[in-house]
């Protein structure tokens, strides 16, 4: 039982974070109060600003405090003719770290899931359709997760692209670098075999 309502409220608030249970939240609270009150104040200020000032990019729907994010505001990225469709802003960061993509993005903020009542309008496909209609898009790279929902979402968007005469491609899925075949699941191995490519000398 907590000795302070504020302690209890803060502990409960921290539990909204993924992977944080009662014990972890309590340890965080005690650490901030005992050892790092200034850090706690900075955290509170940063959270308050972020929650009130960060919105969505008007073009790609990623998180930004500006009307348009820095990637969408870059003329070179817009002129590439490529849009990479991802499920979350975190996926953009992962792809950007590779340094292999120089186009623009579109963030779904999820995936199609009829059983959960999530349809095309809920993941912003209307906005993607507008971009296909109004921009000079040559290729849409579908980088949704390799799940049942992710594949269904990719197929739906691929059909949409076909309607506008835009090429749709799917990122490759397969055996991870350094992985061993005996440890790979059957579905991943099937994708690897289907996506094999010739070795050129």
UniProtKB/Swiss-Prot annotation:
PROSITE patterns: RECR, TOPRIM. CDD domains: TOPRIM_recR. A zinc finger (C4-type) spans 57-72. InterPro entries: DNA_Rcmb_RecR, Rcmb_RecR, Rcmb_RecR_Znf, TOPRIM_dom, TOPRIM_RecR. One of its GO terms (molecular function) is zinc ion binding. GO terms for biological process: DNA recombination; DNA repair. Residues 81-176 form the Toprim domain. The keyword Transcription regulation does not apply. Keywords: DNA damage, DNA recombination, DNA repair, Metal-binding, Zinc, Zinc-finger. The keyword Transferase does not apply. It comes from the Bacteria. May play a role in DNA repair. It seems to be involved in an RecBC-independent recombinational process of DNA repair. It may act with RecF and RecO. Belongs to the RecR family. NCBIfam families: recR. HAMAP family: RecR. This is Recombination protein RecR. It comes from Sodalis glossinidius (strain morsitans). The gene is recR.
């Amino acid at each position: 039982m907590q000795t302070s309502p504020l302690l209890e409220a803060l502990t409960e608030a921290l539990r909204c974070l993924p992977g944080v249970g009662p014990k972890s939240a309590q340890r965080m609270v005690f650490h901030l109060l005992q050892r790092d009150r200034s850090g706690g104040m900075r955290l509170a200020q940063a959270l308050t600003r972020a929650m009130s000032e960060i919105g969505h990019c008007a073009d790609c729907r990623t998180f930004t405090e500006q009307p348009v994010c820095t990637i969408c505001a870059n003329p070179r990225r817009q002129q590439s003719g490529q849009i990479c469709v991802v499920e979350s802003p975190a996926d953009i960061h992962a792809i950007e770290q590779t340094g292999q993509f120089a186009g623009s993005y579109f963030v779904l903020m999820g995936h199609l899931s009829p059983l959960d009542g999530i349809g095309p309008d809920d993941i912003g496909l209307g906005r993607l359709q507008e971009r296909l209609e109004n921009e000079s898009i040559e290729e849409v790279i579908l980088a949704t997760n390799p799940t049942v929902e992710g594949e269904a979402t990719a197929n739906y968007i691929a059909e949409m692209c076909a309607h506008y005469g835009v090429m749709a491609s799917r990122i490759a899925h397969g055996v991870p670098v350094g992985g061993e075949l005996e440890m790979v699941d059957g579905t991943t191995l099937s994708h690897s075999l289907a996506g094999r490519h010739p070795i050129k000398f």
